[in-house]
From Swiss-Prot:
HAMAP family: Salvage_MtnC. Monomer. This is Enolase-phosphatase E1. It is an enzyme of class 3 (hydrolase). Its cofactor is Mg(2+).
Length: 227
């Protein structure tokens, strides 16, 4: 079956891992405590703070304890959904203030634009929240790229290393798994997508190999029609 849709990871794929770890995470770590204290009563924030309490098994945790938990989770790089949501809110504030610009590799920008023009439906699947994904592409160094994408998926669709997550996403895309090309730099994610029936292509930007999958060093080398 010809490829009709392309589902891409962000970290290490469209964007530098260093942007996430050296720019976004430190920004969130620095600004999260004040943001939570300032906005704790707002419904959207309060909902996420309650989710932190539930996840930690500490239903009576006060705001300062919740902040301490969030900072622990950041240090551990935990993929906790409420942490991701709150980080997204802090990043949105930073992007809107012009303090942050999303990093997207130039080869990824060019390829995504080209594929969009060719009629491929483009989607994102990242461990970062959907809001954070939209900000990286909507406020990127290359301008607003959000119009290229038909949809975004995060860990609310399931863990990235489990095949069922990719089946769930294919259903949500209303597209047979065999018509979807998944791009990632993590072999376990590629394995899971492949097990769900998707075509896969690995991004090995620093060289190296991604065993069991076709892989390239740049988006410029990906031809969806060849899968």
């Amino acid at each position: 079956m010809p490829i009709k849709a392309i589902l891409t990871d962000i970290e290490g794929t469209t964007s530098a891992v260093s942007f996430v770890f050296d720019v976004l995470f430190p920004f969130a770590r620095k600004h999260l405590p004040a943001f939570v204290r300032e906005h704790a009563e707002q419904p959207a924030v309060a909902q996420q703070l309650q989710a932190v309490r539930d996840l930690a098994g500490e239903p009576d945790a006060d705001v300062e304890r919740v902040i301490a938990l969030l900072l622990e989770w950041i240090a551990e790089d935990r993929k906790a959904t409420p942490l991701k949501a709150l980080q997204g809110m802090v990043w949105e504030q930073g992007y809107n203030a012009g303090q942050l610009k999303g990093h997207v590799y130039p080869d990824a920008v060019d390829a995504l634009k080209h594929w969009h023009q060719q009629g491929y439906r483009l989607y994102v699947y990242s461990s970062g929240s959907i809001q954070a994904q939209q900000l990286i592409f909507g406020c990127s160094e290359a301008g607003d790229l959000s119009g290229l994408f038909s949809g975004y998926f995060d860990t609310t669709s399931g863990p990235k290393r489990e095949a069922q997550s990719y089946r769930t996403i294919a259903q949500a895309m209303d597209c047979p798994a065999g018509d979807i090309l998944f791009l990632s730099d993590i072999v376990e994610e590629l394995d899971a997508a492949q097990a769900a029936g998707m075509a896969t292509c690995g991004l090995a930007r620093d060289g190296g190999a991604l065993a069991g999958h076709r892989y390239v060093t740049s988006f410029a080398l990906i031809d969806p029609a060849s899968f």
